[in-house]
Amino acid sequence: MLSPKRTKYRKQQRGRMKGKATRGNRINFGEYGLVALEPAWITARQIEASRRAMARYVRRGGQIWIRIFPDKPVTQRPAETRMGSGKGNPEYWVCVVKPGRILFEMGGVPEATAREAMRLAAQKLPIKVKFVTKANFEEPEPVQKAAPETTEVAASAI
């Protein structure tokens, strides 16, 4: 299963999943993709189950790219432990996914095959997803920061 080789810190805070994905929201490698429609934590086990389902369906044909990586540790306390005495130990790894994020890409297979493989992968995931192709995929607009409004000071006011 996927997990980082080493991290700077063993434990992380939970954080929030606000807004849409600004990175990883374009199809870069294959011809077809699976886009997240909801925010969620996706575990390393779910990613691996999805990958196996796709690989088993396409067999030797085509290529699969996993566009997400579980880099966030989730801690759990041991069973029947009293409150206090610090944070629990890291038990598994998750990937924070926001709406619009490309989860998987596929290439080198017909669209019908890719669509069915992605459908099987989607059943292993805890969120709603959408199948997209490079041809019909609308590019997300780049976020432009508004320029600060400058108010001109009248010369007589100085």
Swiss-Prot record:
Q: Which GO terms describe its cellular component?
A: cytosolic large ribosomal subunit
| Family, similarity comment | Belongs to the universal ribosomal protein uL16 family.
How this chain assembles, per its entry, is: Part of the 50S ribosomal subunit.
Name the record gives this protein: Large ribosomal subunit protein uL16
Entry-linked HAMAP family: Ribosomal_uL16
The Gene Ontology terms for molecular function here are: rRNA binding; structural constituent of ribosome; tRNA binding
Q: Where is this region: Disordered?
A: 1-22
GO biological process, alphabetically ordered:
translation
Pfam families assigned: Ribosomal_L16
According to its UniProt entry, the function of this protein is described as: Binds 23S rRNA and is also seen to make contacts with the A and possibly P site tRNAs.
Looking at the record's lineage, which domain of life comes first?
Bacteria
What keywords tag this UniProt record? Answer: Ribonucleoprotein, Ribosomal protein, RNA-binding, rRNA-binding, tRNA-binding
Which CDD domains is this protein grouped with?
A: Ribosomal_L16_L10e
Kindly indicate whether the keyword Ligase belongs to this entry. Answer: no
